[in-house]
Swiss-Prot record:
PANTHER family xref list: CYCLIN
GO CC terms, sorted: mediator complex; nucleus
The protein's name in its UniProt record: RNA polymerase II holoenzyme cyclin-like subunit
SMART domains: CYCLIN (SM00385)
Main location: nucleus
Localization per record: Nucleus
Organism name: Eremothecium gossypii (strain ATCC 10895 / CBS 109.51 / FGSC 9923 / NRRL Y-1056)
Subunit note: Component of the SRB8-11 complex, a regulatory module of the Mediator complex.
Keywords: Activator, Cyclin, Nucleus, Repressor, Transcription, Transcription regulation
Length: 332
């Protein structure tokens, strides 16, 4: 355990360069191609009024259901953690830790070989223990089942079993450092001379929201927390500057130059935000939910298969995607 990011396992064990992160994901990509060469078969409703459902194959080389390439999946995972966290009134720090656990886990394991909903539940359970705001496991499982009854098993021991698997994949490095505290420290430094720049509560709230969104991206696997905080504050100040506060932008730019923060890393982080919001405009939740229903609940012929235990379901249930984007034959 380390109180300093610079001596922490996050920096020494779980911080990647762009190149090393790409190599790590390429290994998982190759493994998925070997394990699931036939891809995933899905059942889609035919175009005509009386048309029969049609089976469609999604090749394994498609981006769908690959965490590193499928922003639909990333955004959906983010919403799953936030939804369950809010039901349990979990602190944001613990949810941030859960997001990092999930991102690290998805470097080592495919979504096709685990139950995503059980993974989300376990990440929150473990994060709450690490952040010293533990949740009773039965309460956690009951709330998770109220959201995703088909996917989360009623037996709490399934979560504890998955917890050991999660800890093993994380190599027992549990401590996570956040940009939230760095953002507060930067805001305090800006208030002091010679900058005398006071950010409004709305500015700080916008920056906080940007940090929340950053957990969908790779920046927490790439850069120190203070770089992410600086990028979020820079975006907030730019938005204020566009509204007419030019002096604010000039003062903040001077502060960034004086701070000696790596501006290339800050700009890379901002670019990740731009990429994220571009994909967010195209976010299609019914599609990713449908794919996960097919992956975990529907019996497959010649495609990806997931056992009932791994899916955490009471049994198979057929689901069909209709032309208007709704899912039939399911309750989630």
């Amino acid at each position: 355990m380390s109180a300093s990011y610079w001596d922490s396992s996050q920096r020494n064990k779980w911080q990647y360069s762009r190149e090393s992160l790409a190599r790590t994901r390429q290994k998982l990509w190759m493994l998925e191609c070997q394990l699931y060469p036939q891809g995933t078969n899905i059942l889609m409703e035919g175009g005509g009024k009386d048309a029969q459902p049609v089976t469609k194959n999604i090749p394994i080389t498609h981006r769908d259901l690959h965490y590193d390439r499928d922003y639909n999946l990333r955004i959906y995972c983010y919403f799953l953690i936030m939804k369950l966290g809010r039901r349990l009134n979990v602190r944001q720090y613990a949810l941030a830790t859960a997001h990092v656990y999930l991102a690290r886990f998805c470097l080592k394991a495919s979504i096709r070989e685990v139950n995503l909903y059980l993974l989300v539940t376990t990440c929150i359970y473990l994060a709450c223990k690490v952040e010293e705001c533990p949740q009773h496991i039965r309460t956690l499982v009951n709330e998770a089942r109220s959201l995703w009854p088909e996917f989360v098993p009623p037996d709490p021991t399934k979560v504890t079993e998955f917890e050991f698997y999660l800890i093993e994949e994380l190599q027992s490095y549990m401590i996570v450092h956040y940009p939230y505290r760095a953002m507060e420290q930067i805001a305090a430094a800006l208030r002091r001379p010679p900058y005398n720049l006071v950010l409004s509560p709305d500015d700080l709230q916008n920056s906080w929201s940007l940090i929340n969104d950053s957990y969908i991206t790779d920046v927490h696997l790439l850069y120190p927390p203070h770089v992410i905080a600086m990028a979020c504050l820079f975006i907030t100040v730019c938005l204020r500057s566009a509204a007419g506060a030019r002096d604010l932008q000039e003062t903040f730019n001077r502060f960034m130059a004086d701070s000696q923060v790596d501006l290339h890393e800050v700009m890379d982080t901002i670019q990740d935000f731009i990429t994220l919001y571009d994909h967010w405009d195209k976010y299609n939740e019914p599609w990713i939910k449908f794919l996960l229903h097919n992956l975990y609940l529907r019996p497959h012929a010649g495609g990806t298969t997931v056992s009932g235990a791994a899916a955490g379901s009471a049994g198979p249930a057929g689901s069909v995607l209709t032309p208007n984007g709704t899912i039939t034959g399911s309750t989630s």
